[in-house]
Amino acid sequence: MSLSIDVTSLPSISSSIYKHESSSTTSTISGKSIGRSEQYISPDAEAFNKYMLSKSPEDIGPSDSASNDPLTSFSIRSNAVKTNPDAGVSMDSSTQSRPSSHIGCDQVDFSLNRGIKIDAMVDSSISISTKSKKEKSKHETKNRKCYPKIEAESDSDDYVLDDSDSDDGKCKNCKYKKKYFALRLRMKQVAMQLIENL
């Protein structure tokens, strides 16, 4: 199971991608050939030296130095270019030869011999409703209208209760004792009504 990617030469972009031409052996995009063609190279020092000397220094990349040992690196490369279309690793093989391509719900398929085709299933939905909020605001305004209006009047600032008297809930020596208790009762009713509405 291996994938062949040859980046030895970088010519112009192949026209077969745009003309939808089919190729039985390899498909090219940006000068990088990815295909099922088998390439056998003799893994000896002479062939390796000839191969490396035939390339310009700009074209030598990381794929040419997979190991510090030149012979091991060359052997790794020679084995990597042998591909099997039925193993599911060749990118230009058809989807029928890859049984694992139909597994799962989301599928991304690359077909380089007839252009690039990407299939993905994406679904999203956003729903925003403001109906309940409007009804709630109307309900709150109705409750506010039902609240009793509280009015308190005082003839003079001399009749303000002391803190000690107000904490005990009693009004001693106050001319407005009846008004005080009536006002306190109304405030208690309003507080209870507020608690019930909440």
Swiss-Prot record:
Keywords: Glycoprotein, Host cytoplasm, Magnesium, Metal-binding, Nucleotide-binding, Phosphoprotein, RNA-binding. One of its GO terms (cellular component) is host cell cytoplasm. The modification Phosphoserine is found at residues 67, 154, 156, 164, 166. Residues 16-37, 53-72, 77-104 are annotated as: Disordered. Its main location: host cell. Residues 91-100 have a biased composition (Polar residues). Mg(2+) binds at residue 92. Its cofactor is Mg(2+). Coiled coil: none annotated. One of its GO terms (molecular function) is ATP hydrolysis activity. One of its GO terms (biological process) is viral genome replication. It is found in: Host cytoplasm. InterPro entries: Rotavirus_A/C_NSP5 (IPR002512). The keyword Magnesium applies. Belongs to the rotavirus NSP5 family. This is Non-structural protein 5.
